[in-house]
Amino acid sequence: MLTIGVIAIQGAVSEHITALEKVSRGLNYRIVRIKKKGIIQNCDGLVIPGGESTTISRLLRFEGLDKEILKNQHIPMMGTCAGLIILSNYQDEDAEGLGLMDMQVKRNAFGRQAESFEYPLEVKVFDSPFNAIFIRAPAIKQVGNGIDVLARFKEYSVAAQQGNKLALSFHPELSDDLRFHKYFLQLFDS
């Protein structure tokens, strides 16, 4: 049985768990919430949900989860919204990425909460558009070697993959479309 951990310190944790349970139904997966250290090393994959990147970054450090993520960086990971920032090279006085994906990001690239929106994205790995939900979303400004851009919006990349790491500017867990969660499970074979 494969275990997927969902960092459960902020964000749409329950929605990610529900989506993962739906796409893994009938398969050999177990989904667990991670609030404290000592669990990540038993996981075969990890989801870092959205939320407020400063808060998530601080809580990851406070709980020691940042070190556990780095120690287990070989496992598949999906970061959504603020989770994208955590996977990236992002650095400022308030939040710090873990540098697991070679990309530079911009926080709140699409405005504040009131400017949240949905957009039908053309995604490289899907046959039809994905209705992406952007809420105070970050954007990928620049990618390094080994990054495969899966989707763009305006001048920014908003979905990217590097090996078995998947970073999304938007919130697939808030949609009824489960394709990104299914795609994440495919990363377990790569």
Residues of each region from the PLM?
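C-terminal and late-domain segments of enzyme folds
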Residues: 11, 139-190
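Structural motif
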Residues: 47-49, 134, 167-169
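Cysteine-nucleophile active-site neighborhood
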Residues: 53-122
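Beta-strand-turn-beta hairpins that frame and shape the catalytic cleft
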Residues: 1-3, 127-130, 160-166
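N-terminal beta1-alpha1 cap of cysteine-dependent amidohydrolase-like domains
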Residues: 1-62, 68, 178-182, 186-190
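Pocket-forming structural segment of enzyme catalytic cores
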Residues: 94-156
